[in-house]
Every structure is written in structure tokens, then in C-alpha cells.
UniProtKB/Swiss-Prot annotation:
Family indicated by similarity: Belongs to the PTH family.
Protein's organism: Thermotoga neapolitana (strain ATCC 49049 / DSM 4359 / NBRC 107923 / NS-E)
SUPFAM superfamilies listed in its UniProt record: Peptidyl-tRNA hydrolase-like
Annotated site (Discriminates between blocked and unblocked aminoacyl-tRNA): 8
Enzyme category, top tier: hydrolase
Protein name: Peptidyl-tRNA hydrolase
Gene behind this protein: pth
Length: 186
């Protein structure tokens, strides 16, 4: 299984809402990342399953550019991939697991769907909350989490990790039925 977390490379974006995919992968494994031309990767073990963690380095809106390289490098097909990314239409504290679907207005996912030519891509969307009234969407997603929001996010990462374990052990349908209705709070 290859888990692709979406985000933007570089310290400027490290703790922004849009980098939830990268932050989740760092939660799973913080040290020992290796670099390739279009991505960084690492391996970790979840409940006895070895998984590969991948961060595309092409910036969010061009995430799809890295996908053919990732798939070739790890010798996987689209069925072996789960994409993890931020979602402004979900409350902070919620995740949504899907087997397939549209990009939902997310440019990183749009790029991946275009590059792979299919919407049948497994995904975990992590809620970052709706932008405040009157705030520009770009400013919101490129803004950093508050201290309180980051506490919630750590619990969301634990929930997302458990969802991944369920996907590995019992399948994505089971994970969807268990985790799509849950919400964490601090």
C-alpha cells in the first residue's frame, strides 16, 4: 500500500492547513525520508503491514505530475494507492474516506485524477473547516493552524491512522462505515 499525502514543499508551507497530507505522513513517520526527483518517501509499519509514505514535491496544484513516477518507482497501480488531503467542506475533527469520486474542487486531487485518467482513487479527506466569512480561500488554506486547532488535528491523525489500519485489515468499505460518521474534539 502506498499512502500519498498532499501538500506544498518547503518551510513556508510546513504547518499550513493545505499541508494536512504531509503533516499526517510526518505523524506516521517523522525521520528517515528519502528524496527522488518528484517526491520524498519513507516506509513504516502499521499493524504488521508495511506501507510506503509518499509526499509529491510538485506543489499541490501539480500533484498529478508526480503520480506516474511514484507508481513506476514502487511498481504499483492505482488500486494500491490511498491519497490523503485537506478538505474545507469538512469540519476540523472529521475525516471522510472514499473509494472514488470527483475532485470536489480540490486542485491537488484534480491534478491526480487528470494524470491517472480515473476518479477511482481511494482517499482520506481530512477536514480543516470552512473558511471564515470574508476571508479569501487561498489565504485560509495557506494559513497555519492555531494551537487549539493543532490539538484537534493530532487526534484526527490518530483517527486517520486507525482508519488506515482498518482499510489494511478489513477493507475500505468497513473503514468508511466506521470512520465517516466519527468526529473528534479536544
Amino acid at each position: 500500500m502506498v499512502v500519498v499525502g498532499l501538500g506544498n514543499p518547503g518551510p513556508r508551507y510546513a504547518f499550513t492547513r493545505h499541508n494536512v497530507g504531509f503533516l499526517f505522513l510526518d505523524y506516521l513517520k517523522s525521520k528517515g525520508w528519502k528524496s527522488e526527483k518528484f517526491f520524498e518517501w519513507n516506509k513504516t509499519e502499521l499493524d504488521g503491514h508495511e506501507i510506503v509514505l509518499v509526499k509529491p514535491l510538485t506543489y499541490m496544484n501539480l500533484s498529478g505530475v508526480a503520480m506516474p513516477y511514484i507508481m513506476r518507482f514502487f511498481r504499483v497501480n492505482v488500486d494500491d494507492i490511498i491519497v490523503v488531503y485537506d478538505d474545507v467542506s469538512l469540519k476540523l475533527g472529521k475525516i471522510r474516506i472514499r473509494k472514488k469520486g470527483s475532485d470536489g474542487g480540490h486542485n491537488g486531487m484534480k491534478s491526480i485524477i487528470q494524470a491517472l485518467g480515473t476518479q477511482e482513487i481511494k482517499r482520506i479527506r481530512i477536514g480543516i473547516g470552512e473558511k471564515p466569512e470574508g476571508m479569501n480561500l487561498v489565504d485560509f488554506v495557506l494559513g497555519e493552524f492555531s494551537e487549539e486547532e493543532f490539538k484537534v488535528l493530532q487526534k484526527v491523525f490518530e483517527l486517520s491512522r486507525n482508519a488506515l489500519v482498518t482499510i489494511l485489515n478489513e477493507g475500505i468499505d468497513k473503514a468508511m462505515s466506521v470512520y465517516n460518521s466519527l468526529e473528534v474534539r479536544v
